[in-house]
Amino acid sequence: MARQNFLGLVVSQGKMQKTVKVRVETKVFNKKINKELFHRRDYLVHDEGEISREGDLVRIEATRPLSKRKFFAIAEIIRNKGQQFALYESEAQLSVAKEEAQKAKEFLDKRSVRENKLNEKTTLLRDIRTIQDALSSGSTPKELLEIKQRYGIQDFSQETVRQLLQLDISGLEVNLEKQRSLIDRIQTRLSELLSNDLKCDQFLKDHGVEDPLTLKKNIKKNLLRKHVMMDMQQPSQ
């Protein structure tokens, strides 16, 4: 006597040892509407080798009752989509972990640069205060020797303090000028792209935006500004 066979999809695995849940679709004729309908039924199926994965298309075959609800076993894996997905999932997890590690490294590098710049400014202000204290008290602490070497100063006076303050202000002015120049270049580039739809769409495509023609005007402008800013800031990183 031929054994009963079904084709089904593995919808659950790993919850019970050597057992998977397989969903089988069969056509059932409905007399009320005089039409065939798909009927779904889930079977608990024995998987001796525990090789089937969720998403696999399998052929199940009737066997002796293995438990109260389990009387089918995996006979053949027709299509191992579940195993392919499991492999893809593990590779995706590794890829995401690498990407997160790279982003974390970039963040820490940027923070380190900011902290170094802040430390330089703090050191300058601390040195100015040390010089002022030394001038008011008439003493020459050991720190003054280090300050001389750091800035190439021969003698300490109020003029020295003014020069160091000017050095700090000059640094701020340079940074401010750089920011202004960057903003001007971004605005110029943005205006250039917005005035030419072909250039604008090609620019977005080159930066990974799919089908920019279908985007709303405000969304397109925001994406354009984002990628222009990233391009302009890239050389300075």
From Swiss-Prot:
One MF term in the entry's GO annotations: structural constituent of ribosome
For this protein, the record's InterPro entries field holds: NA-bd_OB-fold (IPR012340), Ribosomal_uS17 (IPR000266)
Q: From the Swiss-Prot or TrEMBL record, state where the protein is found.
A: Mitochondrion
Q: Which SUPFAM superfamilies match?
A: Nucleic acid-binding proteins
Biological processes annotated in GO: mitochondrial translation; sporulation resulting in formation of a cellular spore
Q: Which residues form the signal peptide?
A: none
Per the record, its GO cellular-component terms are: mitochondrial inner membrane; mitochondrial small ribosomal subunit; mitochondrion
Q: Does the keyword Repeat apply?
A: no
Q: What is its main location?
A: mitochondrion
Q: What superkingdom heads the lineage?
A: Eukaryota
- Keyword line: Mitochondrion, Ribonucleoprotein, Ribosomal protein, RNA-binding, rRNA-binding, Sporulation
Name the Pfam families on file: Ribosomal_S17
Protein's job: Component of the mitochondrial ribosome (mitoribosome), a dedicated translation machinery responsible for the synthesis of mitochondrial genome-encoded proteins, including at least some of the essential transmembrane subunits of the mitochondrial respiratory chain. The mitoribosomes are attached to the mitochondrial inner membrane and translation products are cotranslationally integrated into the membrane. uS17m may have a meiosis-specific role as it accumulates during the middle stage of sporulation.
What the entry lists under PANTHER family is as follows: 40S RIBOSOMAL PROTEIN S11 FAMILY MEMBER (PTHR10744), SMALL RIBOSOMAL SUBUNIT PROTEIN US17M (PTHR10744:SF1)
Similarity remark: Belongs to the universal ribosomal protein uS17 family.
Q: Recite the other comments.
A: Present with 2810 molecules/cell in log phase SD medium.
Q: What is this protein called?
A: Small ribosomal subunit protein uS17m
Organism from which the protein derives:
Saccharomyces cerevisiae (strain ATCC 204508 / S288c)
Q: Which gene encodes it?
A: MRPS17
